[in-house]
């Protein structure tokens, strides 16, 4: 009987092997592809009819991509298909792993169609609808109970959970993705703070005047067209240095530089070692794991519970997990740190009709969906400035992704990086606000613009090996002469289209800008010519293609200075708090670059501390 069963199983497995796989050359294939970053090396073992094994050999991915590296190889082997769903929150890494297996199958002569069948989808326990206010009764008993419940595991959520538990409250952090970090982990690792424990040293190195809190506040409010809430801006500005020093004390490594992105008129932007947000979120997670806080991944909030009695208080949440639904009590409060809604076309397009579905976003699509706002609105929360949505001007024009190379044009203007259009002419004040730069790029006449520089210009924030890696990856274009660079730019397709840059225009543009550095004035666009700017005097020359991509939503839930969420009548909703991109009012119409990290980290820490203690931290001045 056992022998008959064994034969039956063998036949079943044979029948399960994809049809038309015969003729595939068995062997082990090593493929090098791009995930979120270059250098993803995958070893694929094939028989003459099946995918036998998939092994990640080397990679440069950051923590948001780790779940894809761990889970996807086994999923592909089990399904015998490269059409398996990617891992939520790790799309770029997932695509890289699948591309490597596809390359191996192609090299082996396989019929790709046979290995591209879509597996049956599992039932999604988390519904797409959002409950109407009052549609669910508050539980009489709870599956779990904590003092503080934090929803979301990015900058704000990790900071909030840490300050709450360190202030003496039992704390749980729930995150809908399979890892913490979210969009915070893939940002550019740029952190604005008017001072820090290393500020004086860096200011002395670059001969810079000390910055002030008042100037940071002024720049932020002006950069948002005076639509910010001044008290919230003040909290961010004073909280940011405190939290940066906390990170530095716990081992955060930053580059030996200070930058001045567009809209800032002080050198106050610190750059993390790898110019990626996971430098911060990985450290935040390490800090949190050294406390008694509980972290629950793949746990999606689907309802906020608010009582209907006189207290009318938020007392907990309902979540969906792979094992079903459960309820979590929050004895002191729920902190929403769920991020923005840039990936939710149905949510963003009614606010800004031009942000159509075909426009890419820099963010993880599964992360920036806005349900934290929807669910808070369902219990009466108010929103503000929802139509203030920012595009990142320097994303990869072919993908919309904010990769590490898209950070250099953002950091570079204060050191001499210039932006040119498809003819090789400057089209904007490179030191201006993001919205100004994005609008100028869209109106430049082509679907890409270019950041132009030489190695000395970017030496303060780009290592030589990083520059060479960018060239090897194809994202950074290099020419020993301007003639060669023009040829490289014109040969680089942007969504099937090609520019018409001329070396003569590039030369004239560079010579004119060099003269502006010497004279200290830019009569063309009024850029502030800084002493840190370096002239482009000899090759090799470099260019990075860049174009706007939907990035940050400045609007969100209305909060007060305690981070308490307010309702549609202007009253505080007891027990409900929020921090980070889920809130509105900090940035006004436009967020200055590097203020996002400051906003989320500062308000996350403030929120956790206040919910736990009922007081604001000592570093916050009287408001």
Segments the model singles out, each with a brief description of its role:
Residues 322-325, 329-399, 597-606, 610:
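Glycine-rich loop(s) and the adjacent beta-strand/alpha-helix scaffold that form part
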Residues 303-305, 499-590:
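A glycine-rich dinucleotide-binding beta-alpha-beta segment and adjacent secondary-structure elements
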